[in-house]
């Protein structure tokens, strides 16, 4: 089953991504309320720090980039990219602890947080076109164009369950 938590624009508008703190009903079997509250509040704070243009790290990163004609980003990397990598690892760790798969927040364009339960009988019809093709056996990451809405979620599957799952706990 796919659980999609869409971005909440009422908190910060479009300055930086934030997600609602509501407890998602489909995840109750996997995550308790306290763990969810800690996760979502920490995630929102990390996203604010990473995307807020007026944070100290982002200001220093921008000034250093301009002064070095953006060479510093290639040599040292940017603080923003490091923070986004840490956020991806934080989400991955949370999903792993609670026996869930998660789509990379970067691949989802920071518009939605998508979890997939590890039930073998529930697959999304949008994640694969032909499960018996050889390419299906080598899929290790979630395609970036996949979205899960109520119109394209399939909770049952007619193909073999011994094929590898197309969702992985990986970040790109």
UniProtKB/Swiss-Prot annotation:
Pfam families: Erf4. Disruption phenotype: Abolishes palmitoylation of ras1 during vegetative growth. Residues 152-172 are annotated as: Disordered. It is found in: Endoplasmic reticulum membrane. It is a peripheral membrane protein. Keywords: Endoplasmic reticulum, Meiosis, Membrane. One of its GO terms (biological process) is protein targeting to membrane. Interacts with erf2. The erf2-erf4 complex is a palmitoyltransferase with a major role in driving sexual development. Palmitoylates ras1. Palmitoylates isp3. Palmitoylates rho3. Belongs to the ERF4 family. This is Ras modification protein erf4. It comes from Schizosaccharomyces pombe (strain 972 / ATCC 24843) (Fission yeast).
């Amino acid at each position: 089953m796919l659980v999609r938590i869409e971005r909440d624009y009422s908190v910060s508008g479009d300055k930086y991504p934030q997600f609602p703190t509501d407890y998602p009903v489909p995840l109750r079997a996997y995550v308790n309320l306290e763990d969810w509250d800690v996760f979502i509040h920490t995630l929102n704070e990390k996203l604010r720090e990473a995307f807020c243009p007026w944070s100290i790290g982002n200001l220093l990163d921008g000034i250093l980039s301009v002064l070095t004609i953006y060479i510093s980003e290639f040599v040292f990397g940017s603080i923003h990219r490091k923070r986004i990598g840490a956020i991806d690892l934080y989400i991955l760790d949370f999903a792993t602890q609670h026996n869930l798969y998660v789509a990379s927040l970067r691949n989802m364009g920071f518009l939605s947080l998508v979890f997939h339960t590890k039930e073998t009988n529930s697959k999304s019809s949008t994640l694969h076109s032909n499960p018996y093709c050889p390419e299906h056996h080598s899929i290790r990451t979630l395609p970036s164009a996949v979205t899960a809405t109520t119109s394209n979620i399939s909770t049952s599957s007619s193909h073999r369950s011994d094929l590898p799952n197309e969702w992985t706990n990986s970040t790109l």
